[in-house]
Amino acid sequence: MAFLSDTLARVKPSPTVAVTQLAAELKAQGKDVIGLGAGEPDFDTPDNIKQAAIAAIEAGKTKYTAPDGIAELKQAICAKFKRENGLDYAPAQISVSTGGKQVLYNAFMATLNPGDEVIIPAPYWVSYPDMVLLGQGTPVIIEGKPELGYKITPDLLEAAITPKTKWFLFNSPSNPTGAGYSRDELKALTEVLMRHPHVWVMTDDMYEHLAYDGFEFCTPAQIEPGLYERTLTCLGV
């Protein structure tokens, strides 16, 4: 009898961790390498953040919090959505986690049933398919077109949708390519999604503020109000 569950046996070890560990080992050997694994910045935590954390500890803010985040933080996130994205959310619609990966994983575990499909544009963050598999879902990969900067088209999205599709997982700007969808490109994708009301939208907006050369970030619910009620937005603040 196997010790590991069949579900866990379906996933592979994290490539991100493997690459990060290899880079650390090579650096320890004195070799000059650039690590392209974990997204660790090359600067220290800013002093104002350090001091705020220290002040919170000294003020006794060391107890259990509400499982979905403290009220002040949820209110700040609501204000962020309104200020930067033109979206109105109430604190009850906000859930704070220990990281974006936990948000996506929890969502898949809470919503997927065996046979449910999740559409994932490629190239993609390496954890996406494994999280779907852990939720007993089926990853459906759409290959982005190199001539379009590894982005997908409305026709590719349309062709991937089936009656079993539960989620469309959308990441812009993209990890790993950095590709970002323009307002017009995103509008074209939302028009496809509006024709399929059984498909929910999960947006990984973690790189919202890593935008350069005049790129205007947009998120699906911002482009198409009709998607507001069936969109889960994951971001970092």
Regions found by a protein language model. Give the residues of each.
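N-terminal small-domain helix-loop-helix segment of the aminotransferase-like
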Residues: S5-G99, N106
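Short acidic capping loops at alpha-helix termini that bridge into adjacent secondary structure
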Residues: D88-I94, P114-E117, K164, Y228-T231
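Conserved PLP-anchoring active-site segment centered on the Schiff-base-forming lysine
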Residues: A110-V132
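A short helix->loop->beta-strand "cap" motif at the edges of active sites that frequently abuts
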Residues: D116, G137, L193-W200, Y228-E229
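A short helix-loop-beta submotif of the ANL/AMP-binding
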Residues: L133-V140
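Active-site phosphate-binding strand-loop segment of PLP-dependent enzymes
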Residues: G144-F215
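Conserved active-site segment immediately N-terminal to the catalytic lysine
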Residues: V199-W200, E216-V237
